[in-house]
Each structure stands twice: as C-alpha cells, then as structure tokens.
Regions:
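Sequence-specific dsDNA recognition surfaces
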Residues: 1-24, 30, 41
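Extracellular/lumenal ectodomain signal focusing on beta-strand-rich modules
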Residues: 21, 38, 103-105
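A short glycine-rich beta-alpha junction/loop motif
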Residues: 48-57, 66, 88-115
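Glycine- and charge-enriched low-complexity intrinsically disordered segments
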Residues: 62-64, 68-79
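Amphipathic alpha-helical segments
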Residues: 67-71, 102-139
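Short amphipathic coiled-coil heptad-repeat segments
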Residues: 130-154
Length: 154
C-alpha cells in the first residue's frame, strides 16, 4: 500500500471513489482484447480512503449472494472471459463499459460452496496463487457450474 500514488481527495471524492472490501475493479481499456475486463477484488485489509480512478470500472458485489474471492477466480474462467471480450469494442485500443460487464452471466454456486472454496484458497495462500494447486478445486467448480447451470438444473 505504501507504493500507491497519493492524492488530496475532497470529502466528495472520497465518498464517490473510495473502494471497500466487496468491490470488484475491472480494466476498462487494453492494448489487446485479452486484457479487457481483467478483474481484481478489493482485499479485506484495504486502507481507509483508498480511491479508484477513471481507467477502472468499480462494481460493488452483493456480499449476501457472493464471496468476493470466489468472484475473483470466476472472473478468470473462460466462460466469463468470452462474454467480456464479446462485449468489448476495438479501435486503437480495446475498451469496455460498465454496461458490457453487467451483461455477463454470473454463475453462483450456493454461498456454502463459495465459502468452502474461499477457505481453501485462504488456507493455501492469501496473496499468491499457484495454478497447479488450484487445478482440482477449479475442476470441481467447473463441473458444478456445468451440471447445475449449463444443463439447466438451476
């Protein structure tokens, strides 16, 4: 946090642009289509008065329906990435608006499964993810999503 750029935000700026745990931040523009809409969650330990800026789209998550750490991983899955790239526009740079992100279908397992997944992720390592470590749980989530959503068993 110490290396982040600093600014003198007004109370109005802080009210409008402050991020909190449960916010997802999406890349609004990229030189390549694959970079568009890449997302990160705001971690629980975010310092007070941390603001986002205009090159980022902020979407607050409903914490009664989803676990942010689950959504972080979901945002990297091919199912979600294809939808985001399909909603983007390319001229000199590839861009996407908040409306494009909101058009994506979000597949949410029950909160208990999301929490179970988060507990696993948290136990392995809170900040550095090893793809090979997550392969089994990633496969389980994909199987669940396929069984319950793709085959119409909502």
């Amino acid at each position: 946090w110490q290396d982040l750029p600093r600014t003198n935000g007004t109370d109005k700026d802080i009210e409008k642009f402050e991020v909190k745990y449960g916010d997802m931040l999406f890349c609004r523009s990229s030189l390549v289509a694959e970079g568009i809409g890449k997302a990160s969650i705001v971690p629980e330990d975010v310092p007070q008065n941390t603001l986002f800026e205009c090159h980022v789209i902020r979407l607050p998550l409903d914490l009664s329906k989803c676990v942010p750490e689950y959504m972080q991983v979901f945002s990297t899955m091919e199912y979600f990435r294809r939808q985001i790239i399909a909603q983007s526009k390319t001229a000199t740079m590839t861009t996407i608006g908040q409306d494009g992100i909101l058009k994506a279908d979000i597949l949410l397992p029950p909160m208990s499964k999301q929490r179970e997944f988060y507990a696993f992720v948290h136990q392995v390592n809170k900040s550095k993810f090893d793809t090979m470590t997550f392969a089994p749980i990633y496969d389980i989530i994909n199987l669940y999503l396929h069984t319950h959503f793709y085959q119409g068993r909502r």
